């Protein structure tokens, strides 16, 4: 399609063309190799920003720790992490004064959550550092391994199923002199294959017990594993992100619950809302500042950028905030909430896989694991790496680096937002006590600041005061990257505001196209994305129609399901043509079976099966929606499914789409190669969980699914449920006396076996 791109912009206002400058088409960059270098950068930078703090040594782990809190006040514009405790506490007090009861109410809400949350909350989330195996695992597996180790070491509070009880075990585990864990390992041996008579390598998986002393266990419990952040657009350099272990996660969850509850009550907070709700919140603040500045005042807005937000934040400051916020609350609650920041003050960063070396002349490759960096000869490294290693060496213990100052990415988004909002709150005239005043928006490290004043000097003074206030709380507004405009034009969290929000359509580009789940889900997701963009992102009818046609084309090429009457030859065309010829009502065939596309922009909300149902041949209906079809392994499909969309910025979003179960909703089988690796034990565990959960679901079908209340194990819940159901069935005559007696006997046997165990 040859279009002169200039033509596209003839009628477009300049501000709407902003989205064409975004780096969102094509594949995002991914990282390859190890993240060790990026992690060392993070650790070294963080220490540099706090270098004038006080050094101490952790008595338990022997880790050297740097504490910049209440350090020297900055004399230049360089980023620094010297937050002042009294300033932070005062900012909190003023925040509470402007919002009476906000902390009290949020604490009460959080206390309820703390008492009700179950351990399985921690199974959400993707990769988690598994301290028992010293590497990353899916969250559910990491949690299971942790609980298994706890129980074998006599820590059993977690059996109640409440998260708070699991956390009691975590606390107790840290006092134990030693902890015994089970690790997986691989044995390789060379054997001769009976058939081919060649030598092959045979792998066997073993489990062995290992004892960790208190120091080693504490180091693991406080470790954050690091990885490289993938798919970041518009950056030349990659950066490291952290994933904490199960000991830290539960505590962080409660702190963030409290902070989220506070953020919900703050009009300047861009979290936890998103999308249109966030835009409405934003527009309100702008409107407030514009209305108050009509005649006498001028109003300017800074599109703000902070330098290295995470690396200058400090867990000790968060501890001070929590201590203040919960000051009127019961002791147990204050203790639970203060543990996360204390653990972060003592955190260790795992350096990842280490470095790969290869010798061109000898065709050799070897991996230098992170553990060896402490004492390897540095002559093998290039200059920049050598400098990094020299700098980090004093901090190393067992391949992890002591990292007391700074927060790793994404850990306390809500709480750090509360800190940012507390500065915006200080912009009211009753606090500035002068002619200028400010307000704004904060969302994690991103902010927009609106300053009003009678003249330009006032604006400048206001910005300066804001900048210096930030410095006192360990926040560094970047003078190079922030820019100021007349109010009415600014950007905040990639929303562009120009007398109202301009749709930044380019950010949605990556989600257009075929997702690659299966034929049924992909069709549904594809049209839902187009529908959502018509609702939220100014996608006009003509463009939407074109997007739809391109999507169908893309879909047909992906699944090789071109129309039955086409000339295109693919691997499937023989079957599809045959189906086309024997179908009476060809309009009823799904696109994935070579049928025509009946979608247009008016009916995007209807699942394709429903759209075509009346047009289908009867035998086609029978084949399409037949749960007994032997060629399909069905999972039970909810009426609404969730796809994980990767928008251009921010976390992966859950997108709902309608799902109708057909023979096209297949699930690919698991790759076999995993069965030969040390992951195999984990896979078997997962299957066991799956079976247990399926069994549980049979006893508590979703229609009557209430979580068993009170403290009972899954087995106890199922046995008592079986007894109740059996009695009802017997009394209503649905089962005979013999069957009833047999069920009761089985239940008693199960209980007896449990007692003996």
Swiss-Prot record:
Residues 55-64 have a biased composition (Polar residues). GO terms for cellular component: host cell cytoplasm; host cell nucleus. It catalyses: RNA(n) + a ribonucleoside 5'-triphosphate = RNA(n+1) + diphosphate. Phosphorylated by host PRKCA. Residues 249-256 are annotated as: Promoter-binding site. Pfam families: Flu_PB1. It is an enzyme of class 2 (transferase). Keywords: Eukaryotic host gene expression shutoff by virus, Eukaryotic host transcription shutoff by virus, Host cytoplasm, Host gene expression shutoff by virus, Host nucleus, Host-virus interaction, Inhibition of host RNA polymerase II by virus, Nucleotide-binding, Nucleotidyltransferase, Phosphoprotein, RNA-directed RNA polymerase, Transferase, Viral RNA replication, Viral transcription. Residues 52-81 are annotated as: Disordered. Residues 286-483 form the RdRp catalytic domain. RNA-dependent RNA polymerase which is responsible for replication and transcription of virus RNA segments. The transcription of viral mRNAs occurs by a unique mechanism called cap-snatching. 5' methylated caps of cellular mRNAs are cleaved after 10-13 nucleotides by PA. In turn, these short capped RNAs are used as primers by PB1 for transcription of viral mRNAs. During virus replication, PB1 initiates RNA synthesis and copy vRNA into complementary RNA (cRNA) which in turn serves as a template for the production of more vRNAs. Influenza RNA polymerase is composed of three subunits: PB1, PB2 and PA. Interacts (via N-terminus) with PA (via C-terminus). Interacts (via C-terminus) with PB2 (via N-terminus); this interaction is essential for transcription initiation. Interacts (via C-terminus) with human PKP2 (via N-terminus); the interaction competitively inhibits the interaction between the RNA polymerase subunits PB1 and PB2. Belongs to the influenza viruses polymerase PB1 family. This is RNA-directed RNA polymerase catalytic subunit. The lineage of its organism: Viruses, Riboviria, Orthornavirae, Negarnaviricota, Polyploviricotina. The gene is PB1.
